[in-house]
């Protein structure tokens, strides 16, 4: 059974690779390479997979899942300039893809139980742009 919990956070970032020239960054990332950055109101969907516990009837305690998402993602990333305030984005380009991978890394170890595991991280950068990440294959 799949269970999905939503959360949102606002953050700013700039997409630029320090090993590339200004011209290369602008060609690659366009306006997203503006050194002053820009922001998004991200929507995060965290999906876990498991069987309902025979005693509780729940796959996972929803309050605990919310607390984990807040502690690992929302609290450290909300209203932050990712490049300057949230490792590893001081040395990794904070694309939506890379942010989704980092969120996975932060959550995977916190959700791993004998019969429950993290299935997918979906991160919306805008209403019509999102990334799905299901861990390394």
How does the language model describe each region?
Residues 1-137:
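Charge-rich, low-complexity N-terminal segments
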